[in-house]
C-alpha cells in the first residue's frame, strides 16, 4: 500500500480518511431520506383515511403524544396507583358490571320466557348461590310467581277495582298495628254484613260492578 501511495496510484492516508467520512455521511443521509419517505407515506395514508381532521388537528395530537407519551410500564403503574387510592371501589364497579352482563346473558338464553328462567335457576343454582348472586331481585320475582294464582282469584272476584284500591289485607294490617282501636272504630262506623246485604239489594248496579267488596 505504501509503494502504491508513493507511485501515486493510491491516495494518501489522509485522503482515505476523508473518503470514509464522506461515505458515512452519505449512508446517514440515505437512511434519513428513507425515514422521511416513510413518514411522508404514513402522513399521506392518515390524511387520506381521516380527511381534514388530521390536517386540522394532526400536529396538535402529534405534539401531545411527544409531550405526554406513556410507556406500557407507566400505564401499569398508573393502574396500581388507582387501586391503592380507591381501594375496592373500582373492583366493586367491575364486578357489578360483570354480574349485570351475566344476568342479561342468562335472560337472553331463556328467550324472555319467565317459566324457563325459573326452571333454569332452580336446577342450576342453590338458593344460597341465587341470594349471593342476585340479592333480593330473584326473591321478589319468585314471590310474584307464587302468588300468581291468588292474584288471579282476586282479580276475578273484584275486577279492576282492586287494581285501583289495593289488596284486602290492608284492613288486617291496620288491625294488627292499632289493636282494639280499629275494632271499636269498625263496630262504630262500618256497616255490618246484614246492612251490606240490604244495601246491595237496594243498589244492584253497585253490586254488579264491585261484587262482594262493597259488602265488606
UniProtKB/Swiss-Prot annotation:
Q: Does the keyword Mitochondrion apply?
A: no
Cellular location of this protein? Answer: Secreted
- Give the propeptide positions: 64-85, 93-131, 144-155, 165-175, 183-207
Modified how? The N-terminal domain contains 6 conserved cysteines thought to be involved in disulfide bonding and/or processing.
- Please tell me one Gene Ontology term that the record gives under cellular component: extracellular region
Q: Which domain of life is it from?
A: Eukaryota
* Coiled coil stretches, renumbered: none
Alphabetical UniProt keywords: Cleavage on pair of basic residues, Disulfide bond, Endorphin, Neuropeptide, Opioid peptide, Secreted
Alphabetical list of Pfam families matching this protein = Opiods_neuropep
Function, as annotated, reads:
Enkephalin neuropeptides compete with and mimic the effects of opiate drugs. They play a role in a number of physiologic functions, including pain perception and responses to stress.
Could you say which protein family the record assigns here? Answer: Belongs to the opioid neuropeptide precursor family.
- Identification of the protein by name: Proenkephalin-A-B
Q: Which species does the entry assign this protein to?
A: Xenopus laevis
Gene that specifies this protein = penk-b
